[in-house]
């Protein structure tokens, strides 16, 4: 029994905690939704305007419900949409997405005007191929080739 298991006994899969979403701020919500839904193929789960807080949120996922893991796109109304985006600081790295056809996906994204930062390549012979792209707000997204040979992306 691992040390973590001694402290975290959750029982069945349904009782286990799960990562639900990660939030990023975007300068233009419509532009971000075009990128994540039209170009990456994610599903729009919900979109809500919160007038009291002066912001809008949208949840996108490759699944069909919130529990499949999502990205929350948040637009603060007082942030000028003519700015390129928010400062990401030095702490944010990237979001990683498993892609069955990495080369084909990168070709489609590039044809759609998406910036490819790192073309598909393997960092180690035993690791899956990966690529990096940038979303419209400058966030890095790692695309990892998924297959039966590499069941855990990134390892």
PLM features: residue spans?
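Short N-terminal helix-initiation segments at or just after the protein's N-terminus
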Residues: 2-9, 20-23, 34-45, 76-83, ...
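Eukaryotic phosphotyrosine signaling hubs
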Residues: 19-21, 90-95
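Residue-level signal for secondary-structure boundary sites
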Residues: 30, 68, 81, 103-105, ...
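Short, electropositive, low-hydrophobicity segments enriched in small/polar residues
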Residues: 67, 93-100
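Core segments of cupin and vicinal oxygen chelate
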Residues: 14-17, 23-68, 111
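Vicinal oxygen chelate
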Residues: 1-15, 56-59, 97, 103-155
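Conserved short beta-strand elements that form part of the metal-binding/catalytic scaffold
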Residues: 43-87, 133-136, 140-147
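Short, low-complexity disordered segments enriched in Ser/Pro/Gly and basic
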Residues: 13-16, 88-90
């Amino acid at each position: 029994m691992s040390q973590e298991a001694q402290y975290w006994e959750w029982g069945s899969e349904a009782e286990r905690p799960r990562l639900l979403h990660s939030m990023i701020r975007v300068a233009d919500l419509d532009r971000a939704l075009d990128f994540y839904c039209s170009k990456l193929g994610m599903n729009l789960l919900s979109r809500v305007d919160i007038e009291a807080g002066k912001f809008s949120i949208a949840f996108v996922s490759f699944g069909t419900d919130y529990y499949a893991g999502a990205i929350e796109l948040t637009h603060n109304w007082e942030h000028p949409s003519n700015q390129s985006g928010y400062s990401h600081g030095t702490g944010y790295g990237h979001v990683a997405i498993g892609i069955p056809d990495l080369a084909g996906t990168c070709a489609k994204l590039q044809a759609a005007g998406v910036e490819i930062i790192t073309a598909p390549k393997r960092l180690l012979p035993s690791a899956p191929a990966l690529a990096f792209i940038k979303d419209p707000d400058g966030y890095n997204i790692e695309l990892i080739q998924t297959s039966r040979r590499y069941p855990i992306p990134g390892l």
